[in-house]
């Protein structure tokens, strides 16, 4: 009796969750990145000194500081609008994921650390100093990444323009379809590897190798 009740309850929670679960993530992230983008927009197209002095990861390091400033500014503003509307949610969520990784690597990540324990000292809201060394303050950006990831994988939910587009193009059945093959996990490993390679290169390389292996095996199975 209890299990039957629990199953019925979770069935309805999943049903409602398809509509409302992503909303909190979308609106909160939209607010945070809109505020950040508009704040930069008020400065203009000239990057301030603190931004111009940062070492950006490849390939953004090949661009000028002003070009990166404009890209980040408009990336945050447009992504915030898209998240509120639920339009092209996965694309703009992935865009914000890249922006966040670049910010962590350039601003928040310590230049050197001897152990994971020492690195974890930087999991803080404020800058942590240990014997005069910068330990980072990457807690909030990490939380943003954890919030962005479900939108990359699951999309904006049924209460979104993405859902209306699926209905308009008569592809609404795709919402319920799931494909948990090796290629799916290969794509997931690629996304996480792309993030990790700029922060902890060894982990990132291993994930990218795993991605290639999983994807290759998936294509091999199809032959």
Regions found by a protein language model. Name each.
Residues 1-46, 62-74, 87-223:
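Extended, low-polarity transmembrane helix blocks
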Residues 79:
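Extracellular/periplasmic metallocenter environments
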Residues 44-54:
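Short Gly/aromatic-enriched secondary-structure transition segments
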Residues 82-86:
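Juxtamembrane transmembrane-helix termini
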Residues 54-61:
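Short, basic/aromatic beta-hairpin or loop at an interaction surface
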């Amino acid at each position: 009796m209890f299990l039957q009740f629990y199953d019925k309850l979770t069935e309805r929670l999943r049903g409602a969750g398809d509509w409302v679960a992503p909303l909190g993530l979308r609106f909160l992230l939209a607010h945070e990145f809109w505020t950040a983008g508009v704040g930069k927009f008020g400065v203009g197209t000239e990057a301030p000194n603190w931004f111009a002095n940062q070492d950006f990861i490849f390939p953004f390091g090949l661009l000028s500081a002003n070009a990166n400033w404009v890209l980040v500014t408009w990336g945050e503003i447009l992504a915030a609008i898209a998240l509120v509307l639920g339009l092209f949610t996965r694309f703009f969520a992935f865009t914000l994921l890249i922006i966040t990784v670049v910010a962590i690597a350039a601003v928040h990540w310590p230049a050197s650390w001897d152990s994971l324990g020492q690195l974890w000292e930087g999991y803080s809201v404020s800058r942590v100093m240990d014997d005069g060394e910068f330990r980072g303050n990457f807690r909030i950006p990490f939380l943003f990444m954890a919030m962005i990831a479900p939108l990359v994988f699951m999309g904006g939910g049924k209460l979104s323009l993405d859902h209306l587009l699926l209905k308009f193009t008569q592809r609404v059945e795709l919402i319920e379809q799931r494909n948990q093959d090796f290629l799916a996990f290969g794509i997931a490993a690629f996304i996480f590897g792309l993030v990790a390679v700029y922060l902890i290169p060894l982990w990132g390389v291993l994930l990218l190798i795993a991605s290639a292996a999983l994807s290759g095996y998936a294509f091999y199975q199809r032959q």
